């Protein structure tokens, strides 16, 4: 609702005119509302300036003050309009009276400075006069005679800003700068040295770990050969172990001579295994294979030497060369009968593949190693000596002291079993020890 200035219009106009009249002793007027209505009335006038006006402000009301002050720069009269909203006024009243500010500014026109105040700190006389001085725009004064030229006698010589250079202080300043520069350089060198030592230590530990793995593999091979020599049996490792060790050593020397880091022994083993699988497939006779079912049967013994789990192939006894192979083939056919059905008349079209005999040597080598160690290859448990992280999903990860169950010995250097998380996969044999 709009503010009402007509009800007490003559009194309001008289108070305003008395303030703006320069020769009038009245220098301030205070206006407020009549109760909770929007009618404006004169709350009071005075001649005491800002100090007296501030004392009349009520913290529980909305009031409008109009005051005449003297500009400290020019000495001319200036008018100040104060929109006072006390801290005790409720929010509804504050919102309603906020729309009346522009109407009151139009009525009390001619104000040079307008101040919106809520607390006593906002209406301190010093603060108001400072705002009036800033609003004048220039520091000048009227009605003041300028001082005429006066002969004050001879003036003193103009002082110089030159300062004599102090060699000692200059040396100290330069020395201080050099000291901090040297300290920063030493700190940088120290950090670089620590980084270099850490890198050397890491490389040394990595080299020791690789050497330890190679030594453990060599000791395991040597122990395997000694056990076979003590038992009087021919050592298969004399035919397979030494070429494998020589291949690993030769690959390691090639990498070191090329200036590169030697690969992990497991990677060398994988490369050797892939090469053996390729050679075995090439040496077979694909011209005699006319059935996909028989081709699958012939490739199953090939994968038994690798990492995939397959049924164990029976080994021929001493002095027997050709008899056990058909029994192995027939047993494989018996296991596959629910899925594949081979006509009887096709049996005469296939000959006994030499691939089974070629892979028999590898299986015999693994079985001899298993028998020499005193375990059957399945249902074993082992405790982890070192931590190992799986390189892919066919391997398992474990930490020291973890138990690995259901171990299957598929190779001298790689076994399979269930890890701590229940995942079944391969792991290096020299990272664990069997539990009796």
UniProtKB/Swiss-Prot annotation:
Modification Phosphoserine occurs at: 160, 277, 280, 283, 291
Key word Transport present: yes
Membrane topology according to the record: Peripheral membrane protein
Major location category of this protein: cytoplasm
InterPro entries in UniProt: ADF-H, ADF-H/Gelsolin-like_dom_sf, Drebrin-like_SH3, SH3-like_dom_sf, SH3_domain
Site (Cleavage): 367-368
Parts forming coiled coils: 179-233
List of residues that carry N6-acetyllysine: 176, 296
SH3 domain mapped to chain residues: 377-436
Alphabetized SMART domains for the sequence: ADF, SH3
Expressing tissues: Detected in hippocampus neurons and in the Purkinje cell layer in cerebellum (at protein level). Predominantly expressed in brain, thymus and spleen. Also found in testis, heart and lung. Little or no expression detected in ovary or muscle.
ADF-H domain boundaries: 2-133
Modified residues (Phosphotyrosine): 340, 350
Keywords tagged on the record: Acetylation, Actin-binding, Adaptive immunity, Cell junction, Cell membrane, Cell projection, Coiled coil, Cytoplasm, Cytoplasmic vesicle, Cytoskeleton, Endocytosis, Endosome, Golgi apparatus, Immunity, Membrane, Phosphoprotein, SH3 domain, Synapse, Transport
CDD domains membership: ADF_drebrin_like, SH3_Abp1_eu
Region (Disordered): 185-341
One GO location term (cellular component): cytosol
Chain positions found as Phosphothreonine: 26, 299
Any one biological process term the GO annotation gives: neuron projection morphogenesis
Subcellular location: Cytoplasm, Cytoskeleton; Cell projection, Lamellipodium; Cell projection, Ruffle; Cytoplasm, Cell cortex
Gene3D superfamilies assigned: Severin, SH3 Domains
Functional description taken from the UniProt entry: Adapter protein that binds F-actin and DNM1, and thereby plays a role in receptor-mediated endocytosis. Plays a role in the reorganization of the actin cytoskeleton, formation of cell projections, such as neurites, in neuron morphogenesis and synapse formation via its interaction with WASL and COBL. Does not bind G-actin and promote actin polymerization by itself. Required for the formation of organized podosome rosettes. May act as a common effector of antigen receptor-signaling pathways in leukocytes.
Quaternary structure (record): Interacts with SHANK3, SYN1 and PRAM1. Interacts with SHANK2. Interacts with FGD1, DNM1 and MAP4K1. Interacts with ANKRD54. Interacts with COBL. Interacts with WASL and WIPF1.
Family recorded in the similarity comment: Belongs to the ABP1 family.
Description of its domains: The SH3 domain mediates interaction with SHANK2, SHANK3 and PRAM1.
Name of the protein in its database record: Drebrin-like protein
Biological source species: Mus musculus
Gene that specifies this protein: Dbnl
